[in-house]
Amino acid sequence: MDSNTVSSFQVDCFLWHVRKRFADQELGDAPFLDRLRRDQKSLRGRGSTLGLDIETATRAGKQIVERILEKESDEALKMTIASLSALRYLTDMTLEEMSRDWFMLMPKQKVAGSLCIRMDQAIMDKTIILKANFSVIFDRLETLILLRAFTEEGAIVGEISPLPSLPGHTDEDVKNAIGVLIGGLEWNDNTVRVSETLQRFAWRSSNEGGRPSLPPKQKRKMARTTESEV
């Protein structure tokens, strides 16, 4: 097993522990608590994949961080802070919308890279809006936290989420996954719209109705792909 993979997991475990202690003092806001909950699931998945104990990894991560901080200079800290200042966390959904359980009458699922796409293909003739919570750096989508498809009545009918055991994805991965989800929903004559933040950072171009501008041929291809693969 690669040593960098192990040490990265150890540091992530310790930093999660620090953030958990912060949250236990009721100091974290909703986005902070949401990331904490999802990172916990991710760490459990990674620990299982790597065969590493989280408690032991947390102790080892603490030692690594302490060694780094002992050598940290003020100038290096300033440079790190400057790079972080460009990172933003954008939220279309409330914490309740993100944590709400939902059920599918005709469940369909597809794994695309490190992203899992789920949708209910029993939904027909509805107007659906895609909402997402994600981080942005230098005006580009960096990490998708969660994307969900809602009907006008507020029901959840689709979702794109990172797989805890396969961390890491690009903005193109997210765009492709959104295309698959839209294609699957449109197959049943649903009208799909995209939130303003997703239009700005995930699609870059859209029509006036908030719908991604995809050629009809590409729409049909996505729908067929979803029907056969999801």
UniProtKB/Swiss-Prot annotation:
Positions of short motif Nuclear localization signal: 34-38
Chain residue ranges for the region called CPSF4-binding: 180-215
GO cellular component terms, semicolon-separated: host cell cytoplasm; host cell nucleus
Function description: Inhibits post-transcriptional processing of cellular pre-mRNA, by binding and inhibiting two cellular proteins that are required for the 3'-end processing of cellular pre-mRNAs: the 30 kDa cleavage and polyadenylation specificity factor/CPSF4 and the poly(A)-binding protein 2/PABPN1. In turn, unprocessed 3' end pre-mRNAs accumulate in the host nucleus and are no longer exported to the cytoplasm. Cellular protein synthesis is thereby shut off very early after virus infection.
Domain notes: The dsRNA-binding region is required for suppression of RNA silencing.
HAMAP family assigned to the protein according to its UniProt record, in alphabetical order: INFV_NS1 (MF_04066)
Identification of the protein by name: Non-structural protein 1
Source species: Influenza A virus (strain A/Chicken/Hong Kong/31.2/2002 H5N1 genotype X1)
